[in-house]
A protein has these predicted regions:
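Vicinal oxygen chelate
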Residues: 14-18, 24-39, 66-74, 83-87, ...
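N-terminal beta-strand motif that seeds the catalytic metal site of vicinal oxygen chelate
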Residues: 15, 23-60, 93-100, 152
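Mid-chain, well-packed structural core segment of small domains
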Residues: 94-122
């Protein structure tokens, strides 16, 4: 199931990329490659900061009632399904955070580094095999911390 809607372009460059040919992209050019298409990127969830566990549970339960999804408790947060994460004690970001799912974190990190977005290495979370399943960017955008995530 696709969780986002992409606009498919029909330019020759895009078609060549889709056929598996290697293509380069620089921060100063517009090309058919974008992270949504290249990394099957979509919004995994929105994070909301609560001041304590009771408030977090109440907020998550409201989203659960709104969307008919289960409330799932994790050590740092409550989830309403997989769409909304409510942090128990003021998580990252002034206003909260946005998690973007990608299919290849190392490649996505390289892509975004080429555009001047730095990774906060202290935020990196690893799978037992040593691969990354979550990492934040250093800077917020409009008060939101941004992280990349992959399936564990």
């Amino acid at each position: 199931m696709r969780r986002h809607a992409s606009r498919f372009r029909t330019s020759p460059i895009y078609l060549n990329y889709r056929k598996g040919e290697t293509m380069t992209d620089s921060p100063n050019t517009t090309s058919a490659i974008n992270p949504v298409e290249q990394f099957d990127m979509y919004v995994a969830h929105v994070g909301i900061n609560a001041s304590n566990a009771d408030e977090a549970e109440k907020i998550a339960n409201l989203f659960t009632a709104l969307m008919g999804l289960p409330t799932i408790e994790q050590p740092p947060s409550f989830f309403a399904g997989t769409l909304v994460e409510v942090m128990k004690q003021n998580g990252r970001g002034t206003k909260g955070h946005i998690g973007f799912h990608v299919n290849n974190i190392p490649a996505a990190e390289k892509y975004f580094a080429g555009r001047g977005f730095e990774i906060d290495e202290t935020s990196r979370r690893l799978n037992p095999d040593g691969s990354t399943f979550l990492v934040y960017f250093k800077d917020e955008i409009a008060g939101f911390a941004i992280h990349l995530t992959m399936d564990k």
